[in-house]
Each structure stands twice: as structure tokens, then as C-alpha cells.
Amino acid sequence: MTIFREYIGFLLRSLGNIHVHRGHKDIFLFATARGGSTWMMEILASQPRFKYYDEPFNIRRPNVQHAGIIHEWRETMPDAGRGADLIHFLQDLQRNRFRFMNPAPFRRHHRLVTDRIVFKIHCLEHLINEVKESCDGQIVFLLRHPIPTTLSRHVFPRLDHFVASCHFQKNYLDETQVREIRKIHCGGTDFQRGILSWCFENLIQLRFADTHDWLFVTYEELLLNSEKTCRTLAERLSLPRVDTMIAAVNTPAANIKMSRQDTLNILKDSNEQKRKYALVTKWKDKISDADERRCFEILELFGLDVYRHNRIVAHDRYLHHADTVEIAAQRP
């Protein structure tokens, strides 16, 4: 019965979209899992004639399993040497060759006729610029504070592969870093291991990649300074409808059911600014100051300063608007 249901789902996806690319570049949204990426994808997908591919390398999903391109998380790692295959798969998706990978017909922002795509991807950190060039895409890189991101996650499926990666040890880490990382991996708490995973998943992008033509967006600025940030998105990505993006900012993501009860309670608050501030700061009541300090010790181990102790928004160089820090400091 399950197989039959999956087959019907694949059939509906295959028949539910006609895609012909015209003009503007497709958007490749890279982010860490539970960092607001579904919400961000839906904000971008609110635009006319857009469709989306939601985690086309997530091996837990039946359509990804059916595609058969990858079967294990390690195949997304640089050590596997599968880069050309993975990029070719993205190119095939651009050409609508795996039609069963299309969005489900009854999901939010589904459209029968489309001409532009947003891809949401939680891996391929080492291939972002190759994806940009090979797929002629625009890169959006979404950041969220490592503590709430980690607290929202239940598993870190690629952490073991990161720690064992010869590619990372050779290109991005020295012996002292590798030794300390292994100590945390083997003897740290789940929280510390989650921060470790966040650092690995963002290290290349924040320290080593050529990012001059990427668009960095932080979850906190998009939420707290929504209108200005949506206008920045529209300008940089050639998006015509700022109004639909602003509306999407205030609409919970389709995966809201994965959120904890405290988040669901916050979303019921009718005061928009109070609600947004609570979403950005609620994690501070869930950890000790010692844990927060330990988080930033791990970031320092990787040479990362994008977020700092006792500050809820990213470093100024990752923000687009001067008043975001002031907004973040004003409790509603």
C-alpha cells in the first residue's frame, strides 16, 4: 500500500508542472538544516512562475531515494569524489528531467507553469561555486545563530563524515584543530556536537570560499528587519513582488509541525514585533551562560566570528541594514 501511495505521489508530481526556463537565473539557497531554510525557500517561491526543489539530496525522502543518485550521506562529501554527478543531477532538475522531484501539487506555492527555480540545499558546501558556474545560478547563503539551530535539530547526519574527512583535514584544519575537534566529537555533549556540526557545515563558506557574488542573508535580519531585507532580495535577485515576500515572512513554514511547542505558542501572539523578537531570542532561556560560552569557544576553534557571545544578530559584515542591530536591541 505504501509503495502504491508513493507511486501515485510521484505521478501527480510528474504531471503537475510544465517548466520552461526563461531569462533570469535560478536561485540556489544553501543553508544548515533547521536554520530557517524552508521558510526562506517559501519566501523566494512566493514569486510569480517560481517552483522549488526542496532538499534534492536528502536521502530520507522517497523521491530522492527513487532518483537513485545518492544512497548515503557520505556521497555528498568531498572525499567521495561525486561532485560531477551531483552537479549533473542539479542540471537535470533544471531541465525537468526528474519530474517526480517536482513539488507536490497541493503544497504551498505549487504552480502548473513555471520558468524559474529555487533549490534548497543542505550539503555540497565544497561545490557551491561549481554549482553557480555549471548551473548558471545565483547563490543565496542563509545563516542562523548556531545555538537555536542546534537546539532545533535532533540528528547531525554528516558529523561523523566531517570529522573523518581527509579533505577537511588537508585543506581547512591544522593538527591542533583536528585533535580538539576529535575530543569534542568523542566526549562532548549532544549540544557541543551540534555546534561542531554547525561549524563544519559553515566553515568553507565563511572562511575559504570566494563569496564576492553571493547574497548572504541572516535569519535574524530577515525576521527583525523584514521589509528592508525583502527589498534587498528583490533588488539582488530580480524578484518582482516584494509584497508577496513580506506576506510570506509572516507565514509559518510548511514544516512548522517540526517545531517545538514553545515556538508554536509564540506564533499565536498577535503582536508582530513581539512575536519576531521572541522567535529570535527564545533560545537564551534554554541554555546556561556556560553552554553559550562553550559554543563560542568551539566557533573560535574553527576561526569563526560570524556570531558572538551576548549578541543575537550576526557580525555587521553579514548584515545589509544599519538599523538591524538597533532593532535587535529594542525589546518590544
Whereabouts are the PLM-identified features?
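Hydrophobic/aromatic beta-strand patches that form the interior of the parallel beta-sheet core
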Residues: 27, 51, 138-141, 215-217
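PAPS-dependent sulfotransferase catalytic core
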Residues: 1-103, 159, 331
